[in-house]
């Protein structure tokens, strides 16, 4: 019986279908807890008396040694039967194997033992006055008094024990047999052709367990070292031959490891890791060349464990995932369009793991771990491992803790601006070296395309390679869950945990899920393979899993090579640059704002630049994963809650306003309106029309995660904003209808929230503000009620302290000051709105240091002073609203100072809307239109009309060391520049999400 609560990702219909499918194939009958699980042997000797922290290297170590004694003897016999271990090295070989065997069993025994000792102790069955004494008593008496009860409590553990024992003895015997079968080849790898016997000095197993517990192994002979791989080494052999033949044809030289090939296994020469400077230009250039070759061969999984740094360059040692199959087909399921953004991303260099590759959890502020070969600055690892707290006691605790809390690198405080600039300079230099090598090899492939394709055909046609269908990390998590006391005590839990693979993706084939479950029940990481010239995905024993490749990996790779060109190269370079430099933004357009607030240039040049940006956006759009999905882009993805440690990972852009597809579509709609290019309108419609169809049909939702659904910039309010803008610029009333329908849905939901969350970007208050400011809901009373409850919370002090410490507009108080002032007279209680604004203004005064308002931004530094999101421009917007709608509370001197500060500091940083010059100018344009006599009004008009010439913008957009040039984001990227330029060229009304007010100034 499956447990519903363990599969929360599935809806009720999906869960019932899974239950039915499992029943139809009698899957649970295969999980027998008794028939194939003989009782664990009970040694006759007592448990040794040496127990406790001074006698044992780990908790229960002595108990394990006693329990597994008979199995240890079998390992000794297997080693003794080998022809390759002499008397001198016998203890070392046996010791290494026994350690590995113990670890495999302990992975499943340790947590149940900790739980059981606690249970036995709570029942008063242990003797001793201290927790340490009771632990010793438990271990000594375990065979006689507690062993039977232990296995009764955890019946699945007998099965697990039997599997591990059977697997381990089989793979040890198999290893020695394979050494003997390939001895001549191993001698060739070692250069040991004399008659001296091969003598094995040490043996170290390492890696994940696949296909019956098999794992890689490092074999140190007296003649040298080789690596054993218990799977096909076709990929390694083909890569070696390709590298040799490319060098003969004049390609950049690379080093590859030699292999000896057996049937579904092989041995590889050992590549010694060298101490290499990862900032050295020569090393980076050679790594870039290797990366371009991997890109051509669709090579993946090239992370730090799979390449070895040497003075000659990086040497790959794990090549089972070249010719990676991206275009997979589920039996009976709809095909993904060839032009889909998903497939385009999967083939990109960003997925190779050779670049800095930072993995984060759902909350990026918790840190990251960089697994890339060319790693960047390392952070606090947010992922968790298992530790035993209070070991050698009866009250020991098994706890999951972050790896960073186990002594790994700590995030600490964010570095100062000077340190960030130094790191930025280092990363820019590293990126340039890497890019230089990547461009060289990429262009060499393009210039010798026919020869490259012929080489791939001749060397790769019959390869057997690995098909990576799911990240190994996800499978590893399930294996750990199978070792929990809960899983080992219940067949239902054990079965359901393995069946969580059904929730990994939508529409997974039943055959695939069953194959994964069978592997997991054997305690293996599921492993799948494919032949390069065929379309089937198979298990290690050749069973097809209801999943195929559309054309074969070979044809997919050849087709990929045929489409390599300068436009594609530019996209890959964006991905490379972002991987290196995105955590280190360039925030200086000019030292003095006066240098860029003049010399606008001609309108023709502006239109040419706008056309160039829009052409690029229209050319790089891709279809969704289904014909009815909105079209989108693949690019580095900026975060609306950016932290220094957060890299802009390349991905398929979602339908969000901040950095996603709908913001880009809005900019293209504006460009179509001003420039008159039909192609831009068609591209915008490709994004907007499917969304409008979904909204107006009422049959489906937009499938946004619930936690972001009502966020102004990441959720449905932002989509409604862009649809309304699209309606305005494209003349399409259907888009307006969809915007209002979606806005009404948002309004109805947030109206039910008793204590709305503050913050413009992501709070309920921000959603209400955007809906009101741009008339996105017909029921205005709903968002007004949200503002009223927000006012009540402010007056009562019911809002989190962190919010009170932020003065800015994006996440702080300024947006609330703006909204409560702007709509104070429309709210249920104008006086309450006034009182709340007065409270916020008093708090804002406390953050005023006389020069600017302390921002207290999440990243802990004042990088955005003067701009909209966290700086003076946002404060100016708020104070201008107070001046217009609650004049009795206005502080004109503060407003004037905020405008001056914004003009001085906020117009010289970068070209973004969120925290750069263009957003600052939009804000100041709104302010001076509503407060015409504000300080520096003429300078603002002059900057908007005459500043930011085309050559400056073009130079910045062409500079790939500036992260904002790498993304088409509306808020922090190239489509934001397009929007600003076309609005200025067309002299159209201000329509921007950073100013939540579309009404004309009074």
Where do the PLM segments sit?
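Conserved ATP-binding subdomain of kinase catalytic cores across diverse folds
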Residues: 75-82, 86, 90-299, 304, ...
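Solvent-exposed loop and edge beta-strand segments that line ligand/cofactor-binding
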Residues: 643-661, 700-716, 751-764, 799-814, ...
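Long, well-ordered core segments of solenoidal/helical folds
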Residues: 612-629, 682-702, 734-754, 785-803, ...
């Amino acid at each position: 019986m499956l447990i519903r609560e363990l599969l929360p990702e599935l809806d009720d219909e999906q869960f019932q279908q899974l239950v039915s499918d499992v029943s139809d194939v009698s899957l649970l009958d295969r999980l027998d807890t008794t028939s194939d699980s003989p009782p664990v042997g009970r040694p006759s000797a007592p448990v040794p008396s040496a127990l406790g922290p001074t006698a044992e290297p780990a908790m229960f170590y002595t108990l394990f040694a006693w329990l597994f004694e008979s199995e240890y003897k079998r390992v000794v016999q297997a080693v003794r039967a080998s022809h390759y271990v002499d008397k001198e090295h016998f203890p070392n070989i046996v010791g290494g194997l026994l350690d590995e065997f113990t670890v495999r069993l302990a992975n499943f025994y340790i947590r149940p033992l900790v739980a059981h000792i606690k249970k036995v102790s709570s029942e008063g069955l242990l003797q001793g006055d201290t927790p340490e004494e009771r632990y010793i008593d438990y271990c000594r008496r375990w065979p006689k008094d507690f062993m039977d009860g232990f296995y009764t409590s955890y019946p699945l553990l007998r099965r697990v024990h039997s599997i591990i024992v059977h697997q381990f003895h089989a793979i040890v015997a198999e290893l020695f047999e394979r050494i003997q079968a390939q001895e001549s080849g191993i001698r060739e790898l070692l250069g040991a052709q004399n008659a001296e016997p091969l003598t094995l000095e040490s043996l170290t197993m390492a890696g994940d367990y696949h296909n019956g517990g098999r794992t890689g192994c490092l074999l140190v002979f007296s003649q040298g070292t080789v690596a054993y791989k218990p799977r096909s080494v076709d990929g390694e052999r083909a890569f070696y031959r390709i590298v040799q033949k490319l060098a003969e044809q004049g390609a950049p030289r690379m080093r590859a490891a030699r292999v000896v090939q057996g049937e579904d296994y092989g041995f590889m020469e050992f590549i010694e890791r060298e101490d290499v400077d990862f900032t050295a230009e020569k090393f980076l250039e050679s790594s870039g060349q290797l990366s371009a070759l991997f890109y051509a061969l669709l090579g993946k999984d090239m992370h730090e464990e799979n390449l070895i740094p040497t003075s000659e360059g990086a040497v790959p040692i794990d090549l089972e995932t070249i010719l990676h199959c991206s275009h997979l087909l589920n039996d009976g399921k709809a095909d993904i369009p060839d032009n889909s953004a998903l497939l385009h991303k999967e083939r990109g260099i960003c997925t190779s793991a050779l670049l800095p590759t930072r993995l984060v959890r759902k909350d990026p502020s918790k840190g990251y771990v960089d697994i890339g070969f060319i790693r960047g600055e390392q952070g606090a690892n947010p992922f968790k491992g298992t530790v035993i707290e209070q070991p050698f006691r009866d009250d020991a605790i098994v706890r999951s803790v972050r790896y960073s809390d186990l002594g790994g690198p700590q995030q600490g405080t964010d570095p100062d601006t000077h340190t960030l600039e130094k790191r930025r300079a280092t990363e820019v230099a590293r990126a340039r070296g890497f890019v230089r090598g990547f461009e060289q090899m990429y262009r060499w492939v393009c210039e010798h395309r026919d020869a490259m394709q012929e080489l791939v055909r001749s060397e790769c046609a019959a390869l057997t390679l690995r098909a990576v269908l799911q990240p190994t990390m996800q499978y590893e998590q399930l294996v750990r869950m199978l070792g929990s006391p809960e899983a080992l005590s219940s067949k239902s839990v054990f079965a359901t945990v393995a069946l969580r693979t059904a929730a990994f993706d939508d529409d997974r084939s039943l055959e695939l899920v069953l194959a994964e479950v069978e592997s997991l029940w054997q305690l293996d990481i599921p492993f799948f393979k494919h032949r390069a010239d065929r379309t089937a995905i198979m298990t290690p024993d050749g069973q097809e899993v209801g999943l195929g490749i559309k054309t074969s990996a070979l044809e997919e790779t050849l087709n990929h090579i045929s489409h390599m060109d300068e436009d594609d190269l530019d996209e890959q370079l964006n991905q490379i640059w972002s991987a290196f430099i995105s955590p280190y933004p360039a925030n200086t357009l000019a030292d003095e704002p006066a240098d860029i607030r003049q010399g606008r240039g001609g309108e023709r040049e502006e239109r040419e630049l706008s056309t160039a940006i829009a052409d690029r956006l229209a050319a790089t759009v891709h279809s969704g994963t289904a014909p009815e999905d909105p079209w989108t882009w693949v690019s580095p993805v900026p975060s609306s809650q950016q932290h220094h440690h957060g890299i802009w990972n390349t991905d398929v852009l979602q339908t969000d306003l901040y950095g996603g597809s709908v913001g880009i579509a809005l900019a293209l709609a504006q460009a179509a309106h001003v420039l008159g290019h039909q192609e831009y309108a068609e591209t915008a419609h490709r994004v907007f029309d499917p969304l409008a169809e979904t909204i107006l049909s009422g049959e489906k939702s937009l499938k946004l995660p619930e936690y972001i659904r009502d966020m102004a910039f990441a959720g449905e309010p932002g989509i409604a904003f862009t649809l309304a803008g699209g309606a305005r610029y494209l003349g399409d009333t259907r888009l307006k209808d969809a915007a209002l329908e979606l806005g009404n849905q948002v309004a109805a939901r947030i109206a039910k929230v008793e204590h709305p969350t503050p913050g413009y970007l992501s709070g309920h208050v921000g959603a209400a503000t955007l809906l009101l400011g741009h008339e996105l809901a017909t029921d205005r009373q709903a968002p007004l009620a949200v503002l009223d409850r927000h006012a009540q919370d402010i007056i009562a002090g019911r809002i989190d302290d962190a919010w009170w410490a932020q003065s800015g507009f994006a996440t702080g108080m300024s947006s609330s000051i703006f909204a409560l002032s702007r709509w104070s007279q429309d709210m249920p209680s104008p006086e309450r709105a006034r009182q709340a604004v007065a409270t916020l203004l008093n708090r804002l005064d406390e953050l005023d240091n006389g020069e600017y308002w302390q921002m207290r931004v999440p990243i802990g530094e004042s990088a955005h002073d003067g701009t909209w999101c966290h700086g003076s421009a946002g404060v100016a917007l708020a104070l201008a609203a107070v001046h217009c709608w609650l004049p009795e509370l206005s502080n004109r001197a503060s407003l004037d100072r905020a405008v001056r500060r914004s003009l001085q500091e906020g117009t010289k940083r970068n070209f973004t809307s969120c925290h750069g010059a263009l957003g600052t100018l939009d804000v100041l344009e709104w302010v001076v239109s509503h407060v015409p006599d504000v300080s520096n009004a003429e300078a603002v008009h002059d900057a908007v009309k005459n500043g930011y010439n085309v050559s400056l913008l073009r130079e910045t957009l062409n500079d790939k060391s500036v992260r904002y040039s790498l993304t088409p984001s509306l808020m922090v990227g190239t489509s934001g520049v397009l929007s600003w330029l076309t609005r200025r060229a067309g002299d159209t009304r201000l329509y921007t999400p950073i100013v939540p007010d579309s009404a004309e100034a009074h």
